[in-house]
Amino acid sequence: MRRRLSLGALCVALSVCTAACSQPAQGLLRDIGDRDTLLVTFNPVDTENWILAELYQTSLDSAGHQAYSHDNNDSVRQGYAALIRSIREGDADVAVVCTGTALELLDPAKAKELSEKFAAKGGQTADVNSGEARDEVYAAMVASLPETVAAANPSTTEGCENSAGETMLELPQNIVPIFRKHLLDHHDRQSLNKVSGMINRADLDELDDKAIELQSVSSAIKPYFIDNDI
């Protein structure tokens, strides 16, 4: 089993204020924000989600925005549904989710249909993580999003290990950022797509271990930013 450190535990271990532990209040960000100020939200149940949020945040900074990452405390109790709601209601601008979990929350009937289809097609050896299944679940998730919400390209890497108690179906769980559609232009979306296309499981595991070792997500991922020209 991989080591996981919750956001709260990491903040306590640091014993100092870090960017994700003590950001400006969410309401303040919404008050002072404009199109160039973006809030990236994530489920703070483990460091991997924080790492992903900071990667997407940095890509938006590079695209000319002032972006912040913000841990969504509601998602600790309410799961990824709280992240989706925060985008739909305009409390955040970008959220890090996963395709299967998002689809099951947004359109349970379609999620069940696809899960049964994959199981029937492959029986006990069904590969729900095949490229075909991944693309089909992503397309269904995009179709299920509210009309004011859009999605960047999914990563080939899966996440949302902590959604097991929230979702019941065997579906691909590819990492994907969703966002408020009117706020991001083509260039911004390409910036998100770059991160999705670049990140892989080995990278995430290494960054996760490094963040725990250094007790700092920002310090762990800074070399990755530079090496990958984010």
Regions found by a protein language model. Name each.
Residues 21-25:
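Bacterial signal peptide processing site
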Residues 187-230:
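An extracytoplasmic/periplasmic, membrane-proximal ligand-sensing/linker region
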Residues 168-186, 206-207:
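A bilobed periplasmic-binding-protein/Venus flytrap-type ligand-binding module shared by bacterial periplasmic
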Residues 65-85, 102:
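Short helix-initiation/N-cap motifs at beta->coil->alpha
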Residues 47-66:
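Short, polar/charged alpha-helical segment
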Residues 15-20:
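C-terminal motif of bacterial Sec signal peptides marking the signal peptidase cleavage site
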Residues 33-47, 66-71:
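Short, well-ordered beta-strand elements
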Residues 54-59, 76-95, 108-109:
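Short helices/loops that flank or line small-molecule/ion binding pockets
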